[in-house]
C-alpha cells in the first residue's frame, strides 16, 4: 500500500493526461443526497487503491455552491496530519446531526402561525448556528491550504458581481486568500433564508478587501462551468501545472457533476397565475419562494445544457457524468425541511439516484432523457473511479521518474 505525503497536494495535470473536476450543486438540506453519492464514489476508489484514499486525492478541482460549497470544504480541508478532515461517508451523518439546528423547524403554536410576517421582517433563519459550526469545523484554514484546488461561487450584493473564490487565485491575489469558513457562510447565505454575510480580509501589505455576500446559487447553482473556466484561465496564463493543455481542450477534461435533485416538472407556476403577483407573491407564494426557485433552477439547468453541448461537440460524452433527479415531489424538493423523516427520505432518494439509469440532456429540447447505453449511475461511477485511479497512478509514476531524472542530472553536474 502506498504511503501518503502528509500535506502534499495532488500531482498536477502536467504529470497525466486529464484534468479531473468534481462539481457539487447547491440545494440546502438536499446536500445529503450528494453525500450518499460521494460515499459510494469514495468506496469504489478505496476498493481500487486502499482504505486510506479520499475523494480529494483524485480531483484537480472540486467546485461547490451553497451546500455544495460546505461539502467541498469537508472533502478538502486538512486535518492535523495534512489529510482530508472528513471521509465522504461522514457527510451524511454530519447533515443528520446539524441540519435540524441550521434549519430549526417551528413547533407547537409557532408551527400554526403564518410564515409570511416573519419573512417580511427578516430572514427565515438567523444563521448563528451555521456560522458557529463552520467556525469550529474549519477553524483558521485558508483557501490556499485546501488539499486540492477548490472553486466556490458567491455573489457580492454591494458590487452586484459574482465573487468566485478559487485556490488558484488565492495564490496570486492575497486579498482572496480568506478563511474557508467565511467562504462557506457566504455561499450558503440564500436570500430570505439567511442574512447576507459580511467580512473583510487584510493581506500582508495591509490592503483590506470587503465582502458582502449572498448564496452563490443566484449566479451558479451548478458550478461545473465555473470550475472548467477556472482551469481554462490557468491554461491561458501558462500555469506550468497545466502542461501542454490547449485552452479549448475540453476533450481532456473528466467531469463528474452531482446535483441535489429538484422539483418534479409539475408546472407549479404559470404566466397567467404570476401575472397577478406583486413583490410579496414573488417572494412567498403558497409555501414556496418563486423568485429563488426560478433563479436556482435556471442557473442549474443552463450549465448542464452548455456542458452537454460542449462534450457532445467534442465527442467526449463519455468523460462527462451528470447525476441528478428532476422528479422530487412534496417535502423532498424543499431547501430547508430538516425533519428526521425528510432527511431520511432524502438519503433513500440518493440511494435511488445511484441505481437510476444515466440521464443525458437532449440538447434540442433541453429535457432529460435516458442515455443511449443502458447503464445506471452506480455502474458509471465505477467506470469513472477506474479512470481516476489509473490517472492518479500514471501521475505518481511520471512524477517519480521526473524526480529521479532530476536527481541524476544534479549528480552529473556535480
Curated annotation (Swiss-Prot):
The Polar residues compositionally biased stretches are: 405-414
Q: Where is this motif: GXSXG?
A: 64-68
Q: Which UniProt keywords apply?
A: Hydrolase, Lipid degradation, Lipid metabolism, Phosphoprotein, Plant defense
Please tell me which stretches of this chain the record labels as motif GXGXXG.
26-31
Biological-process GO terms, alphabetical:
defense response; lateral root formation; lipid catabolic process
Q: Which Gene3D superfamilies match?
A: Cytosolic phospholipase A2 catalytic domain (3.40.1090.10)
Tagged with keyword Transit peptide: no
EC number(s) per entry: 3.1.1.-
The induction field says:
By auxin.
Q: What happens when the gene is disrupted?
A: Slight decrease in number of lateral roots.
Locate the motif DGA/G: 215-217
Residue ranges of the region described as Disordered:
393-414
**Tissues expressed in:** Expressed in roots, cotyledons and leaves.
InterPro entries (UniProt xref): Acyl_Trfase/lysoPLipase (IPR016035), PNPLA_dom (IPR002641)
Q: Name one GO molecular function term.
A: phospholipase activity
Post-translational modification (record): Phosphorylated at Ser-399 by CPK3. Phosphorylation enhances PLP5 activity towards phosphatidylcholine.
Concerning Pfam families, the annotation shows:
Patatin
Regarding protein family, the annotation reads: Belongs to the patatin family.
Its name, as the record gives it, is Patatin-like protein 5
Protein's organism = Arabidopsis thaliana
Gene field:
PLP5
Amino acid at each position: 500500500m502506498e504511503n501518503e505525503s502528509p500535506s502534499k497536494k495532488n500531482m498536477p495535470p502536467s504529470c497525466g493526461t486529464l484534468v479531473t473536476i468534481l462539481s457539487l450543486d447547491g440545494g440546502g438540506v438536499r446536500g445529503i443526497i450528494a453525500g450518499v453519492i460521494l460515499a459510494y464514489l469514495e468506496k469504489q476508489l478505496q476498493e481500487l487503491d486502499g482504505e486510506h484514499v479520499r475523494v480529494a486525492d483524485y480531483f484537480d478541482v472540486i467546485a461547490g455552491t451553497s451546500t455544495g460549497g460546505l461539502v467541498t470544504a469537508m472533502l478538502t480541508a486538512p486535518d492535523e496530519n495534512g489529510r482530508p478532515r472528513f471521509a465522504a461517508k461522514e457527510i451524511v451523518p454530519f447533515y443528520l446531526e446539524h441540519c435540524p439546528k441550521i434549519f430549526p423547524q417551528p413547533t407547537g403554536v409557532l408551527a400554526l402561525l403564518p410564515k409570511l410576517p416573519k419573512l417580511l421582517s427578516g430572514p427565515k433563519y438567523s444563521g448563528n448556528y451555521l456560522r458557529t459550526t463552520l467556525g469550529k469545523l474549519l477553524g483558521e484554514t485558508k483557501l490556499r491550504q485546501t488539499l486540492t484546488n477548490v472553486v466556490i461561487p458567491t455573489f457580492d450584493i454591494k458590487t452586484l458581481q459574482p465573487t468566485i473564490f478559487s485556490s488558484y487565485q488565492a495564490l496570486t491575489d492575497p486579498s482572496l486568500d480568506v478563511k474557508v469558513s467565511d467562504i462557506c457562510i457566504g455561499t450558503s447565505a440564500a436570500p430570505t433564508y439567511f442574512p447576507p454575510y459580511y467580512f473583510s480580509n487584510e493581506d500582508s501589505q495591509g490592503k483590506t478587501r470587503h465582502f458582502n455576500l449572498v448564496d452563490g446559487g443566484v449566479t451558479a447553482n451548478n458550478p461545473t462551468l465555473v470550475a472548467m473556466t477556472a482551469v481554462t484561465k490557468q491554461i491561458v496564463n501558462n500555469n506550468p501545472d497545466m502542461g501542454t493543455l490547449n485552452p479549448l481542450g475540453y476533450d481532456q477534461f473528466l467531469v463528474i457533476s452531482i446535483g441535489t435533485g429538484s422539483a418534479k416538472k409539475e408546472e407549479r407556476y404559470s404566466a397567467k397565475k404570476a401575472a397577478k403577483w406583486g413583490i410579496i407573491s414573488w417572494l412567498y407564494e403558497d409555501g414556496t419562494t418563486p423568485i429563488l426557485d426560478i433563479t436556482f433552477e435556471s442557473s442549474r439547468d443552463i450549465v448542464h445544457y452548455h456542458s452537454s453541448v460542449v462534450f457532445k461537440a467534442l465527442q467526449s460524452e463519455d468523460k462527462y457524468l451528470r447525476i441528478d433527479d428532476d422528479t422530487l415531489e412534496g417535502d423532498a424538493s424543499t431547501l430547508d425541511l430538516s425533519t428526521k423523516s425528510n432527511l431520511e427520505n432524502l438519503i433513500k432518494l440518493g440511494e435511488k439516484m445511484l441505481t437510476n439509469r444515466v440521464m443525458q440532456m437532449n440538447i434540442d429540447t433541453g429535457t432529460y432523457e435516458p442515455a443511449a447505453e443502458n447503464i445506471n449511475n452506480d455502474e458509471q461511477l465505477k467506470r469513472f473511479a477506474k479512470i481516476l485511479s489509473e490517472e492518479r497512478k500514471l501521475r505518481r509514476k511520471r512524477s517519480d521518474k521526473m524526480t529521479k531524472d532530476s536527481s541524476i542530472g544534479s549528480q552529473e553536474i556535480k
